[in-house]
């Protein structure tokens, strides 16, 4: 299964991705982790990214897509993966789709964790209070408001893009973590046993 999790900051994407990884053998692919790994490995695209980052510049979408293209060919991604932190806008989504099409594949689903902004604020405040050493710098109302504004501006068109393609699945992210996990498994047609998602997505048993 090739999957994207969408949701605003504090929605619990990381937790849900980790649960899917552990229960269903999907590997969580973080854009930042992939960039650092590509640089460390000295791959061709990693060297390009290293030079760009050394200049303090943002890594272009085509370079990030190239790194993703290399990463999903690795053995641990054979059972599927969850993209974390990419795409963030429609242009990136189109570039990702083009790359996957070139490999003769496509995304299976895009899961949106729907969470009310006011609930997110409470979650962030709770997380900040529980963090050892004091609140994280970005865990305050002003920082969250800015992050949510950027998220909504970028992601609203992205949600519409995947909805038009029939890929979007939306769950109620305001439920408990266990309930959200259950919803995700339900909309994807997967059970606690690995591999059962295939029959739901393809109609084959």
From Swiss-Prot:
Keywords: ATP-binding, Cytoplasm, Kinase, Nucleotide biosynthesis, Nucleotide-binding, Transferase. ATP binds at residues 10-15, 127, 175. Residues 126-139 are annotated as: LID. One of its GO terms (molecular function) is ATP binding. Its EC number is 2.7.4.3. It comes from the Bacteria. Residues 30-59 are annotated as: NMP. It catalyses: AMP + ATP = 2 ADP. NCBIfam families: PRK00279.1-3 (NF001381), PRK14527.1 (NF011100), PRK14531.1 (NF011104), PRK14532.1 (NF011105). Catalyzes the reversible transfer of the terminal phosphate group between ATP and AMP. Plays an important role in cellular energy homeostasis and in adenine nucleotide metabolism. Belongs to the adenylate kinase family. Consists of three domains, a large central CORE domain and two small peripheral domains, NMPbind and LID, which undergo movements during catalysis. The LID domain closes over the site of phosphoryl transfer upon ATP binding. Assembling and dissambling the active center during each catalytic cycle provides an effective means to prevent ATP hydrolysis. This is Adenylate kinase. It comes from Parvibaculum lavamentivorans (strain DS-1 / DSM 13023 / NCIMB 13966). The lineage of its organism: Bacteria, Pseudomonadati, Pseudomonadota, Alphaproteobacteria, Hyphomicrobiales.
């Amino acid at each position: 299964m090739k999957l994207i999790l969408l949701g605003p900051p504090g929605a619990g994407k990381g937790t849900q991705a980790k649960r899917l990884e552990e229960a269903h053998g999907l590997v969580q692919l973080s854009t930042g982790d992939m960039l650092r790994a590509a640089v460390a490995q000295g791959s061709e695209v990693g060297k390009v990214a290293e030079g760009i980052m050394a200049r303090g510049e943002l890594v272009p979408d085509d370079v990030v897509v190239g790194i993703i293209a290399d990463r999903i060919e690795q053995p641990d991604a054979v059972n599927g993966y969850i993209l974390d932190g990419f795409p963030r806008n429609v242009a990136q989504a189109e570039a990702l789709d083009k790359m996957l099409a070139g490999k003769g594949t496509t995304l299976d689903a895009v899961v949106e964790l729907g969470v009310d902004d006011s609930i997110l604020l409470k979650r962030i405040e709770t997380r900040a209070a529980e963090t050892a050493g004091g609140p994280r710098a970005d865990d305050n109302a002003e920082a969250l408001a800015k992050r949510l504004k950027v998220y909504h501006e970028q992601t609203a068109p992205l949600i519409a893009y995947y909805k038009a393609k029939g890929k979007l699945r939306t769950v109620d992210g305001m439920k408990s973590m266990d309930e959200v996990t259950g919803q995700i498994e339900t909309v994807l047609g997967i059970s606690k046993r690995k591999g059962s998602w295939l029959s739901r997505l393809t109609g084959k048993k």
